[in-house]
Amino acid sequence: MATTKSFLILSVMILATTSSTFASLEEMVTVLSIDGGGIKGIIPGTILEFLEGQLQKMDNNADARLADYFDVIGGTSTGGLLTAMITTPNENNRPFAAANEIVPFYFEHGPHIFNSSTGQFFGPKYDGKYLMQVLQEKLGETRVHQALTEVAISSFDIKTNKPVIFTKSNLAKSPELDAKMYDICYSTAAAPTYFPPHYFATNTINGDKYEFNLVDGAVATVADPALLSVSVATRRAQEDPAFASIRSLNYKKMLLLSLGTGTTSEFDKTHTAEETAKWGALQWMLVIQQMTEAASSYMTDYYLSTVFQDLHSQNNYLRVQENALTGTTTKADDASEANMELLAQVGENLLKKPVSKDNPETYEEALKRFAKLLSDRKKLRANKASY
């Protein structure tokens, strides 16, 4: 009798624990963030291809797409372009690009995007005409409200001196943000000195003309948009009726995948205090952006890692980043075939590397674990919706 009673108690405990785990997973808000970095977008493109492939295997569905699994997908610069590629609908209302089409996109169009150098010292390095052409061709007349999941794409308005964040959740209050995706993608990629700023106009809720004068989203969020994506997810959880059960969102209820485009350790070894003490404005101008982006990326990752660890939810956050780029792979605009091949190899090799010195788990293993959480959560929500 005692044995039977003990068995019943154990069974109830296991059931309660399992139910609690499933309920917790079902309530998770899932966020994907993709850094900027020009042609180095090949690196996160490789990671996204691996992740989507794992999801397709787990769910036995060759048509599974990343937009089916993430509540918010955010990006800046080339990360904004990737965001649009995997969330913009085609004629069948499915993402127009599968993840395995991202790297081929860079190989096909990268050399043309970064090949129209104006050769002017006082002007942008590239005219941006081919970039706009291919964006219009691929994205058509699609606007923000048509994205297949919530998006968060940043830019910076040089006339108002304010960041501009394009998201679906802002449209009710600010319909002027319902811009065409190709305008948004060009704007978030219009890095000063590389491409000309972008002007376009939409209409306000009163029908008045609303003008944008935009440059690269990295000016607003630097290169790592993870905190921006988290902020958009938090707002959605507070305002969207579909997320009523998790209005009090905290990091324990979030799954965050942040993809970098690589940094270099060579840069840190190149310059010393003794050398830079002799620098003038021009020399600092050439490297200050790289310094700022690297520092911001490290600090964003440090902050998020600390928060998730303090909440004992470190497995809810995964930052995938290569920190030892060398040679031509450090350049955002080297679209030579040889360099693009190197970048693709960097992405492949990254999967085999440990997540950190303190975590021997490889990125491949971590992404498989992350994919399992995404897959299980999607199934739980689908089952709930069927009742």
Swiss-Prot record:
Tissues with expression: Tuber.
Motif range (DGA/G): 216-218
Keywords assigned: Coiled coil, Glycoprotein, Hydrolase, Lipid degradation, Lipid metabolism, Plant defense, Signal, Storage protein, Vacuole
Protein's cellular compartments: Vacuole
Main location: other
Residues carrying a glycan: N115
Protein known as: Patatin-01
Organism: Solanum tuberosum
